[in-house]
Amino acid sequence: MAQLSDLEIANLSKLKPISEIARKVGITEDALEPYGHYKAKIDINQIQEQEKKGKVVLVTAMSPTPAGEGKSTVTVGLADAFNKLNHNVTVALREPALGPTFGIKGGATGGGYAQVLPMEDINLHFNGDFHAITTANNALSAFIDNHLHQGNELGIDQRRIEWKRVLDMNDRALRHVNVGLGGTTHGVPREDGFNITVASEIMAILCLSRNIKDLKEKISRITIGYTRHHKPITVSDLKVEGALTLILKDAIKPNLVQTIEGTPALVHGGPFANIAHGCNSILATETARNLSDIVVTEAGFGSDLGAEKFMNIKAREAGFDPSAVVVVATIRALKMHGGVAKDQLQHENIEAVEAGLVNLERHVNNIKKYGVEPIVALNAFIHDTPSETACVKQWAKDNQVRIALTEVWEKGGEGGIELANQVFDVMQEPQNFKHLYELKQPLEAKIETIVKEIYGGSKVNFSSKAQKQLKQFKENGWDEYPICMAKTQYSFSDDQTLLGAPNDFEITIRELEAKTGAGFIVALTGAIMTMPGLPKKPAALNMDVTDDGKAIGLF
């Protein structure tokens, strides 16, 4: 019998009316804004603030293969397992971006029998949040160019406009463009460019805001560029923060959906973890904490990216601590980090598994540096052999690391019971959570701390441009912001071919970006791009739609 695709499994699943899912966690009709039968937004003003809030479980991973290691799948499956054990639980995830869906991923709502539904809706447009963010971002670009055209009262230096347009698509041809061409009636000519929507500062702001008032305040602080005398120009100078917030008034509301097994799921926001902070919205997580005893959430890519930013940016801004952290590992990723070529990962190779464990070990040790005990979820794949699995379990035993074989892709929540029990045990223990660095440290010291403590590097080199920016940012009073590293997800270093757990390498910061609205400084390393490109054979080639409107090819 042929193995069913994720989309086929999703289509065979019976969804419950969204009102029934809402009642399960105490969401009243007044707070529920349905988008059809199976999706809704939540009016956060109608959610009662609880004195005792739910505990947060963070799911992260080891350094992934290009196909990913099933972190979203494990996150959903763990929540379903808690549900099976009769715990009051909600899962909180990021929204998928269209670009990667059509590029390499083909979708991002979990997999197998651990998915959030309706899968095709969530992967394609969902409730319109990304379109609203794209519109708000590009409206700001239009306001900037109009200001230049109408006389430039603020004295904006058109060579130093930092704000770029965005599109929710992987489109390398738009990285560098010229705008305002065609004569004086068409605007002021200048160089511009596009980022992908998930890299927009407005995406980060929406995910770090607590309410509309906070959203507007953060938007007003966005630095869009500089004058010829290097004075920062903000959105508040343009006086358009109200208009931009108006565009986002519905997008800020968390989205309610469900898993295959009927566990409530809040899916909201979607910044990438390699070029942004990689976590779902604070509002969704806090709403889930007010509704449930346990909130299972994830942060993008490995512990060096999404989890580091969760700990030092999101948790700091939101004011909560994770009660447990799950590190997802797979046999195939261990073999890749042990030196096996990507086209040979399906073959048994105990030596490669043993060699690749250094990568997992560093991720486990990274989590311990935050004062939280990690639990390894060994996410089972069809080509794993008993000997390879036993090898990983023996390593965990020898190193006193909690581990659970996780089979949620195949079995849904039932395949995550062992993991749920392990996580619940850790949640009952006192954790000594701490941030990696203090905000009062200089920017370069915070960057060096991340590189040395989390990545295993020995030195940070700053380009001449980055050195000038460090000086300027300090003069502007921006040196107490947290750091958001932009780095490859495939390696601890800034070289994606350097696998395993490299030591004594150097990382170069080529450029810094001040996200004064979101409240962090982005440090760009290596060849990281904020507008990805499509692969030679994008996933879109396998996608279609039937005559009656059913999706084909999402996975």
Curated annotation (Swiss-Prot):
Catalytic activity: (6S)-5,6,7,8-tetrahydrofolate + formate + ATP = (6R)-10-formyltetrahydrofolate + ADP + phosphate
A family per Pfam: FTHFS
Coiled-coil residue spans: none
A Gene Ontology BP annotation from the UniProt entry: tetrahydrofolate interconversion
Family stated for the protein in its record: Belongs to the formate--tetrahydrofolate ligase family.
Top-level EC class: ligase
GO molecular function, one term: formate-tetrahydrofolate ligase activity
Protein name: Formate--tetrahydrofolate ligase
Alphabetized UniProt keyword annotations: ATP-binding, Ligase, Nucleotide-binding, One-carbon metabolism
Residues binding ATP: T65, P66, A67, G68, E69, G70, K71, S72
Pathway entry: One-carbon metabolism; tetrahydrofolate interconversion
Naturally occurring in which organism (per UniProt): Staphylococcus epidermidis (strain ATCC 35984 / DSM 28319 / BCRC 17069 / CCUG 31568 / BM 3577 / RP62A)
InterPro entries for the chain: Formate_THF_ligase, Formate_THF_ligase_CS, P-loop_NTPase
Known EC number: 6.3.4.3
